[in-house]
Amino acid sequence: MSRTVQLVVIPGDGIGPEVIAEAVKALDAVTAGSGLAFQKTYFSLGADRYLATGDVLTDDDLAAIRGHDAILLGAVGGRPGDPRLAGANVERGLLLRLRFSLDHYVNLRPTTLFPGIASPLAAPGEVDFVVVREGTEGQYVGNGGAIRPGTPHEVANEVSVNTAYGVERVVRYAFEQAGQRRKKLTLVHKTNVLTFAGSLWKRIVDALAAEHPEVAVDYLHVDAATIFLVTDPARFDVIVTDNLFGDILTDLAAAISGGIGLAASGNINPVGEFPSMFEPVHGSAPDIAGEQRADPTAAILSVALLLRHLGERPLAERVERAVTTDLAARSGQMATASQTRTTSQIGDAIAALAAQN
C-alpha cells in the first residue's frame, strides 16, 4: 500500500544545507520503489533568515509546519561573534520554540559505537544504548529571573518544573523502548539532593515498573552515571532522565562513541498530535560551510530515526546497515588526504548502499 508523508525540511545555516542534502539523498534512495513517498516542503529558517528578514520563527511558519507529518533539520546558528546576531538567540527562538510548541516531550538520543570507529575509552565493550530525555520541562521552561542584576547583590534563579503528567508520559515511552530492546531501564537523577523532583521521578518509575515486569529497572545518581558511562557503558540499555541531566549525559555519550559528528537525535511527539523533528546533534560549523568538508553521517542517521518513528523499521535498518558498512570502509582506509571524501561523496556512497540493501 502506498503512503505519502508530508515532510518539512529545514536545511538551516552553515553546513546544514550540505548535510541535509545528503540526508534527503539517502531518504530518496532507501524509499525508492517501497510505496513510501515523501512530499517535501522546504523552510528557510535560521540565522540567515533572521539576518534577511528580522524573523526567527513566525506564527505563520509555525502554523504551516504543524500541518506536516515530520521535520528534518540540518543545523542552526550563525557565525560566532557576528554583531548582527547580538541578542537574537536564534537557537532558542527556533529550536526551543519548535520543541515546546510541538510538544516534543521526548528527546531520543541513540548511542552506538560502530565497528571500526575509535573511542577514547581503552576498553569500551559493546556500546549500544539510548537516552530518553524529557524535553519540555525541567530548567528549560524559562521559569526564572534575576533581581538587582549587575550589582554585587544580584540574585538569579532557574526553577526546575517537573509535573506528574510530564514525567509519566516520558517514562512510559522509555519503558516501551526498553521492551523493544534488551529490557533494561535505568533512571538517572539526583534523588539524594533534589528530593522533591527526584522523589516524583522515582515514584513514577517504580509504579510503571509494575506494569512492565519483563523490564529490569535500576537507578543511578547522575554523578555515578557519568562514571559508568566511561568505565562500563555496556551496562546501559535505556536511560531515562530529566531535561538538564539528559542534555549533559547525551553529549558525554556521543563523546565515547565517535563524537557528535555521528550523533543523531529525535525530538518526538509520540502520540502524533504534532510533527516530530529529527536532526544531527552537531552545530552549523560556519567556518567550513560551503567547503564540502562536513560529514553527513549524523544527518543520514537522523533519517533512520525518522523512518523508525514512522513505523518503517526495515527501511530504517537499511539506512543503519549502509552507514555501518560505510564507516567500516572508512576505518579500513585510515583516510589519508588523498582518500578523504567530500560531503556529497559520502552521501553518494551511503545512498548507494541503502538502495542495495
UniProtKB/Swiss-Prot annotation:
NAD(+) binds at residues 283-295. The keyword NAD applies. It catalyses: (2R,3S)-3-isopropylmalate + NAD(+) = 4-methyl-2-oxopentanoate + CO2 + NADH. Transmembrane segments: none annotated. It comes from Leifsonia xyli subsp. xyli (strain CTCB07). One of its GO terms (molecular function) is NAD binding. Homodimer. The keyword Metal-binding applies. Keywords: Amino-acid biosynthesis, Branched-chain amino acid biosynthesis, Cytoplasm, Leucine biosynthesis, Magnesium, Manganese, Metal-binding, NAD, Oxidoreductase. Catalyzes the oxidation of 3-carboxy-2-hydroxy-4-methylpentanoate (3-isopropylmalate) to 3-carboxy-4-methyl-2-oxopentanoate. The product decarboxylates to 4-methyl-2 oxopentanoate. Its cofactor is Mg(2+); Mn(2+). Belongs to the isocitrate and isopropylmalate dehydrogenases family. LeuB type 2 subfamily. Binds 1 Mg(2+) or Mn(2+) ion per subunit. Its EC number is 1.1.1.85. It is found in: Cytoplasm. Mg(2+) binds at residues 223, 247, 251. The record marks 140, 190 as: Important for catalysis. GO terms for biological process: L-leucine biosynthetic process. GO terms for cellular component: cytoplasm. Substrate binds at residues 99, 109, 133, 223. The gene is leuB. Pathway: Amino-acid biosynthesis; L-leucine biosynthesis; L-leucine from 3-methyl-2-oxobutanoate: step 3/4. Its main location: cytoplasm. It comes from the Bacteria. This is 3-isopropylmalate dehydrogenase.
